[in-house]
A protein has these predicted regions:
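Short, well-ordered amphipathic alpha-helices
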Residues: 28-35, 62-71, 101, 125-131
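N-terminal low-complexity, Ser/Thr- and acidic-residue-enriched intrinsically disordered segments
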Residues: 1-51, 55
């Protein structure tokens, strides 16, 4: 298996495991805003998390992170992001989470899945995704972890 750059223009959905966590807050949501600003994010974003939040709480988390990184964010971009954000909640070890996610992704053909979760959960998540049946073309992206 070789690493290659993933072009989000190919994706019809971006799935973020760990969407309510620290990595998403500090890095991913500001990056998604920046990508929206320059037009390179053209797909919905589905967060996956164990935190039991509704849409408003999830959006507040995302927009709080964006506001911290960009003091005067574009209201139109935020409104578009809000309309494209959704959250699937469940335990990473529970098969029902993956069934719920599969239902959300049923019409998608080219998802990019980003694991912003502790490495200890990678096995559970990849096995859970495999059990519900892969979509025709999926990119699985892991954050680079450096230890010094």
């Amino acid at each position: 298996m070789s690493a290659r750059k993933i072009d989000l223009e190919e994706a019809d959905v971006l799935v973020l495991f760990g969407a309510t966590g620290d990595l998403a807050k500090k890095k991913l949501f500001p990056a998604l805003y920046s990508m929206s600003l320059n037009g390179s994010l053209q797909c919905p974003v589905v967060g996956v998390a164990s935190t039991k939040w509704d849409h408003e709480q999830f959006a507040a988390h995302a927009f709080g992170a964006i506001n911290a990184a960009f003091p005067n964010p574009d209201a139109e971009i935020l409104a578009r992001l809000d309309s494209e954000l959704s959250l699937v909640v469940g335990n990473y070890e529970d098969e029902s989470l993956y069934a719920d996610l599969a239902e959300v992704l049923k019409d998608k053909r080219s998802p990019v899945i980003y694991l912003a979760i502790p490495p200890a959960f990678f096995g559970n998540v990849t096995q859970g995704l495999a059990k519900v049946g892969p979509v025709s073309y999926t990119h699985l992206t892991l954050p680079t972890i450096l230890r010094v």
